[in-house]
């Protein structure tokens, strides 16, 4: 019989695939002898089974759950559903990868009207008993029955207003009892049935709800962004309650062993007295700093410090812990490797190496390459910042600079950002439902919540700027406005926020490019030491090339020459070429562009200082270059000595029904060989000039023919290139080597790579087009149906962002396996956008690519991902 349920005493940290991160770590803390309230974990396999069984918990799993409850009763001396000595539990999710706030939690399960009355009497603390019950009704209604939290929050706010108090803790036992009754009435009105009183029914409902939350919209978005497969499922942890809300000698907190924003070594966190754990994370009350716990609970704080040291040494990483103090006694509810900003990740990794806890290789493997992106984000201009006066200040919860127009809802943030507006999302507090809006916003500002609130944790994970807990803001969400320092801000007004200092400014403060910190250099040097694959960049201008070189690029893997045709007056000459009727006319027009292209290439070679440069010849269909407005059409007609109607006829003739599969790429060079001749002259002449100026540089142009699907196409265009290049080199009397290769972006090219490799010096996978043609859908139109594919679980990722290793990847592997035996000197790279995606880089390493090429700002990501792939392979 399959084992679906494990007691905490039966597991350990190595079982995270089965028990989820939270369950595995609770088991590990139990084995370390730490004070963990006992319980059990229902496995991730049970979650998968739940979905296979049509979202039902089968009898076998249910029996094992009830058996585990009986074991818990034996350990705790309490009884589930008993009036006199009830066992109350929490039910929490726990996937194998940490997903803060994405799935659901229920506390105080096992309560009903009878039990709460006995608890109130026996504990001599009716306020605590009714507080637990009203929280349970609210959480169960929201999580299990999907009755929105807001209905209950409105009842709480109404009650506080009537009682003239501002905080939940100021409500009396009688108030909370009345609230519990109001909550049950609300539940009955929304659901049409009484609130469940049977603890077993409550438990099964809660477990189902946690399994169900694996498939909620916010979890799906988070998984897609963080490469977490749907098939993993989530575990469920059922744990005896420890109560932080029994009075002033109780409390709850969240703490990190190091600062998750900066990486500084020292306890960082927050604490609330007389509260339950969700209060800290949800950001409903703004908590006190963890250091204040020492005055309140000296013994528990001393023990907590020891636990922190034990856990960090044990896991050899910064830990994020949840804990509760019940009548002065410490209970550990969770530990996990803490989410951190990119800046903190680098510092922590370097410090752990310096402290002897980690090797260089382990430090490189610890860092999520995607987060490096945020280090290269702009910061506020120092002079402008100095001149600006902050209107107010919150907590600098996630570093960076953000400015934009104020919006008050996640939906508005998505909508405004979609039309190109930069926005700052301003909320009372964020909830997990806000994740899409948080992604779309430049930054997040909240009125409530601390450094460990949902907004702070998620923003740090996404690399977004966040200021939380600015209590000076008077918020009016309904009318979409807030007031700060006497000034009223409406939707669309501009503000700037500083996620490092927590300062809030009126208007837009200019930003400057970020400078790269010392730890960044150390980690990158280690990455370069261990990686075996080269990293190039996709760059069309000397400025891009220079930036990429600063960020560690070792060459250009793709220079798109068509972008150069749009510079200055060149477009006029190119349009003349398109509208010419004879070869001579076309050559005359191209002759005007030749010196300009040559100059561009010289600047690129100079910027690359002898490192390889791959130049792709003209690729887009000609219709992309022709004029569309009347003035430009007339200008072209005059230059050509033609009528406007004649030019319009030529433009109309270029129209294609499917231009991305039409007259483009090498097909242009076959139709108009003079274009390939001109581009070859420009490439070779530029290389000759730069080689003369820098004799010590290894200048070897790589000419790339796009969209080849047949060996005969490549032969035809290559002959034009080689004849032209050899003539130029002979005329100059120099010794210059060059290479002619092709892009593999048509499936047929991959299937016949053994033929193509006979003529090509190199292959470069153009995975944007290869993905498009393998799937048979357009990159520009896929957005119309991809969301439906995600919802239907057909796709988990956008195949244009994350390489499809099963189909497109198989074609790539096939091309290499066919091509290399025919041409052992064949070098192979990738230059699609996938070249900067970590999982795609890892795949490229596995199938033996020589290099990846990506946009300049993704170069550090690719360097780190390439190193991680090499380290993983070595340690496999």
Protein language model regions, located:
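Nucleotide/phosphate-binding sheet-loop regions of phosphoryl- and nucleotidyl-transfer enzymes
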Residues: 1-387, 421-424, 431-436, 442, ...
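Short beta->alpha connector loops at strand-helix junctions that form conserved
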Residues: 40, 447-449, 468-471, 559, ...
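S4-like RNA-binding module at protein N-termini
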Residues: 64, 472-505, 510
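Conserved alpha/beta-domain cores
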Residues: 92, 516, 526-876
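Protease-associated
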Residues: 357-440, 503-509, 520, 524-528, ...
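A short, small-residue-rich loop immediately preceding and capping a beta-strand
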Residues: 442-448, 466, 829
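Residues forming the flavin
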Residues: 462-464
């Amino acid at each position: 019989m399959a084992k679906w349920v494990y007691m905490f005493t039966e597991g350990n940290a190595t079982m995270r695939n089965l028990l989820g991160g939270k369950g595995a770590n609770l088991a590990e803390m139990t084995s370390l002898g730490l004070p963990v309230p006992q319980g059990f974990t229902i496995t991730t396999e049970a979650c998968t089974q739940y979905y296979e069984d049509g979202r039902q918990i089968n009898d076998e799993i249910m029996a094992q759950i009830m058996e585990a409850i009986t074991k818990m009763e034996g350990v705790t001396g309490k009884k589930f559903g008993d009036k006199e000595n009830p066992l109350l539990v929490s039910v929490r999710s726990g996937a194998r990868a940490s997903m803060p706030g994405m799935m659901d939690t229920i506390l105080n399960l096992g309560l009903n009207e009878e039990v709460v009355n006995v608890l109130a009497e026996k504990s001599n603390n009716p306020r605590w008993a009714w507080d637990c019950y009203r929280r349970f009704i609210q959480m169960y209604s929201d999580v299990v029955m999907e009755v929105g939290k807001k209905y209950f929050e409105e009842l709480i706010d109404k009650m506080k207003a009537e009682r003239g108090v501002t905080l939940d803790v100021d409500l009396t036992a009688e108030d909370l009892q009345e609230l519990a009754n109001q909550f049950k009435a609300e539940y009955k009105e929304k659901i049409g049935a009484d609130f469940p009183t049977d603890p077993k029914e409550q438990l099964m409902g809660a477990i189902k709800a946690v399994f169900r939350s694996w498939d909620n919209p916010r979890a799906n978005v988070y998984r897609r962004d963080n490469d977490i497969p749907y098939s993993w499922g989530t575990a469920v942890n059922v744990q005896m309650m420890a109560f932080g809300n029994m009075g002033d000698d109780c409390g709850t907190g969240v703490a990190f062993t190091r600062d998750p924003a900066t990486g500084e070594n020292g306890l960082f966190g927050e604490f609330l007295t007389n509260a339950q754990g969700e209060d800290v994370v949800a950001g409903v009350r703004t908590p006190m700093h963890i250091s204040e716990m020492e005055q309140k609970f000296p013994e528990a704080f001393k023990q907590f410090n020891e636990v922190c040291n034990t856990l960090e040494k044990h896991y050899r990483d910064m830990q994020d812990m949840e804990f509760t103090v019940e009548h002065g006694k410490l209970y550990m509810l969770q530990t996990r490797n803490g989410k951190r900003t990119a800046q903190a990740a680098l510092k922590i990794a370097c410090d752990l190496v310096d402290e002897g806890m980690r090797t260089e290789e382990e430090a490189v493997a610890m860092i999520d390459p995607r987060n490096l992106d945020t280090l290269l984000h702009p910061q506020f201009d120092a002079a402008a910042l100095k001149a600006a006066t902050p209107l107010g200040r919150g907590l600098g919860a996630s570093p960076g600079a953000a400015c934009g127009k104020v919006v008050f809802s996640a939906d508005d943030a998505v909508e405004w950002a979609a039309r190109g507006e930069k926005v700052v999302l301003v909320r009372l507090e964020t909830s997990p439902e806000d994740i899409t809006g948080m992604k779309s916003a430049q930054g997040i500002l909240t009125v409530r919540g601390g450094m460990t609130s949902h907004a702070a944790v998620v923003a740090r994970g996404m690399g977004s700027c966040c200021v939380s807990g600015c209590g000076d803001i008077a918020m009016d969400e309904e009318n979409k406005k807030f007031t700060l320092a006497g000034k009223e801000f409406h939707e669309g007004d501009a503000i700037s926020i500083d996620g490092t200092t927590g300062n809030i400014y009126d208007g837009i403060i200019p930003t400057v490019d970020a400078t790269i910190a010392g730890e960044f250099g150390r980690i990158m040097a280690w990455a370069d030491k261990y990686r075996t694959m080269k990293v190039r960049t996709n760059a069309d201008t000397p400025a891009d090339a220079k930036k990429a070189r600063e960020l560690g690029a070792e060459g250009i893997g793709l220079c798109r020459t068509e972008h150069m045709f749009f510079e200055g007056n060149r477009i006029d000459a190119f349009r003349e070429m398109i509208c010419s009727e004879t070869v001579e006319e076309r050559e005359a027009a191209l002759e005007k562009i030749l010196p300009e292209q040559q100059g561009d290439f010289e600047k690129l070679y100079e910027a690359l200082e002898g490192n390889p440069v791959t130049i792709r010849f003209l690729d887009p269909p000609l219709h992309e270059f022709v004029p569309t407005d009347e003035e430009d059409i007339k200008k072209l007609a005059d230059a050509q000595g033609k009528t406007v109607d004649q030019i319009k006829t030529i433009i109309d003739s270029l129209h294609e029904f499917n231009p991305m599969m039409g007259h483009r790429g090498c097909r242009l060079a076959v139709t108009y060989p003079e274009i390939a001749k001109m581009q070859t002259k420009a490439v070779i002449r530029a290389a000759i000039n730069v080689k003369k100026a820098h004799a010590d540089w290894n200048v070897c142009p790589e000419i790339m023919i796009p969209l080849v699907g047949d060996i005969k196409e490549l032969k035809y265009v290559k002959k034009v290139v080689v004849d032209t290049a050899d003539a130029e080199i002979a005329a100059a009397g120099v010794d210059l080597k060059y290479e002619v290769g092709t892009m593999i972006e048509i499936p047929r090219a991959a299937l016949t790579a053994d033929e193509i490799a006979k003529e090509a010096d190199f292959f470069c996978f153009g995975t944007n087009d290869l993905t498009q043609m393998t799937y048979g859908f357009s990159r520009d139109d896929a957005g119309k149906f991809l969301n439906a594919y995600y919802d239907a679980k057909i796709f988990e990722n956008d195949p244009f962002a994350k390489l499809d290793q099963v189909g497109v990847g198989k074609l790539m592997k096939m091309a290499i396996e066919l091509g290399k035996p025919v041409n052992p000197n064949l070098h192979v790279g990738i230059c699609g956008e996938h070249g900067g995606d970590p999982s795609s880089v890892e795949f490229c390493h596995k199938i033996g690519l020589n290099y990846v090429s990506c946009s300049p700002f993704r170069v550090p990501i690719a360097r780190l991902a390439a190193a991680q792939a090499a380290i993983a392979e070595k340690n496999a």
